[in-house]
Amino acid sequence: IMQHSAPTTALGSEHSILVINPGSTSTKVAVYVGENPLCVSTIRHSDEELSQFQCIEDQRDFRRQLVLDWLHDNHIPLAFDAIIGRGGLIKPIASGVYKVNSKMCHETYAAMRKHACNLGCIIAYELANMQPGGACPAFIADPVTVDELLPEARISGSPLMPRLSIWHALNQRAIAHRYAKEIGRRYEDLNLIVAHLGGGITVAAHQHGRAVDTNNGLD
């Protein structure tokens, strides 16, 4: 099942970006021109569809083709200035935007922890290199392994098992930035508690632009 905003046939002269967010039960896809959403959809995946794959990595071709079909159905050519995918379970890093390369794709594909978000950077990188007019850069932003925890937030009760930072960083930080804009403040100047309530649930304490404590949303 696909839920659409109004499609279009032209991208115009501003920078165009394809956004891909693979989740446990859906793949969200959007095209932005500048800061304006041109077409946004959620492609739902039934249990029956996903059960044909032995592991999440096997869904890569299936989900990539769904994105290509979505572009075709909405008369949008594969010709973007950038493609950005949801960041997966890579090594712990600071928040921000990162350019995808083959090494990142390999690390994500071979990640010890498995989740559909691992497909985000891989599909973005593959589509970026499939563009008929030449490859464009692929990126991820604020992956689920963003780690800016305070030292005391890592204490678990055993020094052998420190608490890990695996959370919905992209959505939480986006909502925090939106809230800050709505009240006329800077995210970096605020102390906030932000909760993500979806297929998974994470709650994080944001202190001056950094999530200094959060529950582990995967393990």
Segment roles from a protein language model:
Residues 4-14, 115-129, 150-153, 167-192:
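Conserved phosphate-binding catalytic cores of ATP/NTP-utilizing and phosphoryl-transfer enzymes
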Residues 13-58:
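Short glycine-rich, Thr/Ser-proximal phosphate-binding strand/loop in the N-terminal lobe
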Residues 15-20, 80-84, 192-196:
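Short glycine-aspartate micro-motif
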Residues 24, 58-62, 66, 118-122, ...:
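Conserved active-site and cofactor/substrate-binding residues in soluble primary-metabolism enzymes
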Residues 32-37, 96-107, 131-134, 154-159, ...:
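A glycine- and small-aliphatic-rich helix-loop capping segment at beta-alpha/alpha-beta transitions
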Residues 39-78, 102, 108-113:
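N-terminal phosphate-binding loop and adjacent alpha-helix
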Residues 71-116, 137, 145-157:
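Short beta-strand-loop/turn "lid" adjacent to the catalytic site in phosphate-handling enzymes
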Residues 153-219:
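Glycine-rich phosphate-binding loop of actin/hexokinase-like ATP-binding domains
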